[in-house]
Amino acid sequence: MKAVIHPGLLHGTVERVICSKSAGHRALICAAMAEGETLLEGLDWCEDLTATRKGLEAMGACFRPEGEAWRVIPGRTAGKVFLDCGESGSTLRFLLPLTAALGQEAELTGRGKLASRPLFPLDEQMMEHGAWLSERGVFPLRVSGRLRAGKYTLAGNVSSQFISGLLMALPLAEGDSRIAITGELQSGPYVDMTLGMMARFGVDVRREEGCFLIRGGRGYASPGQLRVEGDWSGAAFWLAAGALSPEGLRVRGLDLSSAQGDRRMLALLRAFGAETMAAGEEVVVRARPMHGVEIDAGDIPDLVPVLAVVAAAARGETRIRRIARLRLKESDRVASVLALLSALGVSARAGEDEMVIEGRGGFTGGEVDSFRDHRIAMAAAVAACAAEGPVVIREAQAVSKSYPGFFEQFRLLGGRVKEED
């Protein structure tokens, strides 16, 4: 699908931002593993969360709609299970150690770039602790055996999803475990979200310098009812659009004290020069003259595409550091961002771990490729609002991975978008 967007700044109110995909994955898994039923409120079914739900259903859990909420009824399937992870890295990296901790033979598959996304050293650590895995890098990926408690070692600068996956799996193992983190932990807020969700289901992990201590054989306990918080990652696109609009944008349904690392979007927009206001669960952003800044993206990799758009709409040079891991996302996001900016008349360059953007105060029109990457497609849509001519986004359906209603909300805010097959 192509999306053709004509220039026009957005304005108005996002009455309810989509639920946090990161929190949703964790809530679904903890609820499915818990003793007792859980009523989950505030869920929105994007492709990635649907993949996790269907995987847990294959493993024996039942998900029943109740009005706008979902009741999760834990259960176990005997015998081998087949799990389709779609294009969701979280689904793959969370369910893989989970099946092994349960001693459940499984065959995992997926599509797109998922097979080529890294599993090392998670796979190595699992095999050193009782699990057997088939050849990595190709689907189907088969796992059998049972994950043992013990000492695990993971690098902090590869993927926080490896850490989160083991954290959620190891309470189900017999015996206590330790996860030692070597080097600096990047994307630490995602690990904090995991620990926070586990605590709400009665599993407390002790954190010491450079390691996590997990009590085994205790399991999860349902809190009865839980609301999944709003998504700062998804809201970031509307906040960025507000920073381009003199009328501004209002976004509701955000937790200002959230553990989500992408909550930094608000502070970064202030640093660029935009006007921001926040109270309760409501945030307002308006355009003001913006200038280049320096950004450390180590903990906020998902914000880089939309921050690059804001940087291009500002005046002057912006440097975004610690971006190397972006090459291993749904697309090579370093190359994808550079291609997006270039197609819209913006000069930018990147080294191994840094991107430099020469802000020109706006964009030309043009045709851009989403590279089937949801965050590239949504960033391009924000850029189109401040472009000099129409912007065509190829494979714009990629937004469904995390935000199926993105273009519908875009129209409600005054955006002029036409979707073409």
What are these regions (language model features)?
Residues 1-421:
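Structural preference for solvent-exposed beta-strand-turn elements
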